[in-house]
Every structure is written in structure tokens, then in C-alpha cells.
Amino acid sequence: MQEGSKVTVRSPAGSGEAAVAFARRRWALLAAATAVFGGLYLRIFTAPPPAGFASPKAAPSAVSSAKAFYRPQLLPNSTARSVHSATAVEISGGRLRAFWFGGSREGASDVAIYPSVFSPPERTWSPERVLVTRESVQRTLQRYVRKLGNPAVGRDRSGRLWLFFVSVSVGGWAGSAVNLMVSEDEGETWSPPRRLVASPFFNISTLVKGPPLQFADGTIGLPVYHEMAGKFGELLRLDGEGHAIRKTRLSWGQSSLQPVIVPRSETDAVGFMRYAGDPPNRILVVRTSDAGAHWSAPVKMELPNPNAAIGSVLLSDGSLLLVFNNAPENREDLSLAISKDFGNTWRIAHRFEGDPGSPRAQVSEYSYPWIMQDQAADIHVLYTWGRSRIKHAHFNTAWLEGRR
């Protein structure tokens, strides 16, 4: 080498300018992720509390039929071998539109969401059809979907139907997410499903079962629950586009699931939850007096709960109804209880299933009730009948008066 000649020293791969550029990109990505997750955290956990629950519905203008009736019926046979977890909403003409999931078994890859419509004058349900499949959700979300689960339907203030349902991409139900579809034509057509962001971190382990509710400002309250690293309930508040803006804990620990929330005024509501802990097995109850901003600690009721879902509705006359499995260890007895003091005391009014002389399903399980009152003041209960059929009990307040 000649004296004074120029020597170029090259930096090893991964060092120097390349390393600096890589580090800058890494920090930029980290900052972006922090901003996104931080924004989601602030949006979900720091939104102001709502002004109040939407005012409870007024008494229907048409009083429930004077002649008492109670009409139970099984929905038409499903093409799915196993069906479960019905939900329903009233649509135009006094009809009901119901949804449930069905497949070869719960959790199977062939499970789909099925709808059907009930016509009160004809007392008939339409043939089911497939609305949502694992494959259709997977295509729309552009992510792997392993299975589908519970649906829950409700209305927003503008009259649109909101259909929530559970999907799982990895693992069991603890790895669930909640999806939303919206209909502006009473359920004839639906928007593509969209995955709700219910948590800023990973966004998994959120499930739904109970009916959505309305707040006075037009936002939606969605009772949800979690099964990963605990079993507890929450109230998720969504804006008019279905984005989470606030989340409030209903319970803590390892033993509470599937909350059902029933408001009775702009500030007061009661919530019931499935109990999955140590005996004694009892329904859990929580209460709020500030429109869901804070909730009392869960307390066990006197009514039993064999680790099973519950249904509840406040009637237009102020009575509170509860549908539940009236046994601590199994789902063979499905009963109706009524309270005149907003859940402080209860009386059993009827047994839907469990009488020795009543027809029995091959699998003695009667579970996952959904109860609602329509604009004619009639009451509807849908539930899983032996995991093979959905059953519908339709009755009026005159029949209920005879059971009080």
C-alpha cells in the first residue's frame, strides 16, 4: 500500500447507518403502537359516564289480550344437529326475529348463526336460514376464525338492529372476541361483521350473552364477560357507530359470567349473573344507582344456579321476571320467578320444564333463556330444548296474573 493512499473501512452488516435506521424504525413502530394502544385505553376507560339509562318503555297502548293464554311450541327442526343460545327482538308488524347458533356440536367449525321470524297471527316460525358462517366472518375480517358462539340482538335509538356474536380465532372461549352487524331494514339485510375493540391489549376474551340496553344519550350498553385469567362481568358502552368508549367492571374474581342488566329508571338497574364458583350455587346480583358508573359487590341470591345462563325483563307494570334453572346442580328444571319489589323477594310462578309428566328431550337440558315483552304486552321466552331444538313460550299478562 502506498503511503498516503486512501483506505475505505466498511461497517459490518447491521451496524453503522443501517443499525441506526433500524433502531429509528423500531422506535417509531413502538411509539406508534404506544399511541394506538394508549388512545384506545383513554377512549375506553376515560370517557365520561352517560347521563342515564334510557327511560323504561311506557305501558303499551294495547293492553295484553284479556283472555289468558300460554302457548309453548318447538321451533321447526334445524338442519344443525345441535342448537343453542337463542336471542330475539321485536320487528315490524308485531313479529319476532330470533337468532341462535347451531352446528354438529357447540364449538365445532361448522357452527353458524341462524335467524327465523315468528308471526303472532299465524303462530308460526319461518324456516331457518344461514346468516353467518365461520368462513364468511373469516373472509370479511381477513383473519382466521376457528368457531362462532353466542348471538345477542337489540335496537339502537334510531331503530336499527344490532346483532352481536362471539367468534374465536385461537384457543377456547377464553380467546373470544365480539363482532357486530347492523341492519336498517328489520333484519332483511345486514352490514358486514366488524370486530369490536373491547380491550386495548390483545382484544381477546370478551363474550356476550345478555341483551344490549340503551342510554339516554343514544349510546348502547353491552353486558359482556371474560373467561381468561378470571371470570367476571363488565358493561361495555358503545357510541352510535359501535366503538367502545367506556368499560365498567360488574364483578371480579373467578366465578361470575353472562350478566343480564335490567334498568328501571334513568339511574337504577339490577344485574344478574351466572355463578361458576364453589357451593352454594346461587344466582349473583349487582345493583347500580348512578346509571352504571358504579356497581355494588356481587351478592348471592336465594335462587339456585347450576352454572347456567339467566334471562330477565322488567314488565311495563313494574314486575320483574326471571327465567332460570331452579336447581343447584343441573339444567333439568327451567322456571319463571316474579318479583314485585325489583328483585328483593321472589316467588316461583311457573315451571317451563321439569314436570314429571311433560315431554322430555333426549338430552335433559333446558337452558340459556331469553325473555322479552312485546308492544302488545305479551311475553316471549326462548330457550335451548335438549340441545337439539329451540323452544318458544308465548303468554300474556292475563295468564301471568293467574300465576302470581
Question: Where would I find each of the regions flagged by the language model?
Answer:
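Asp-box/BNR beta-propeller blade signature and adjacent active/binding-site loops
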Residues: E3, V9-R404
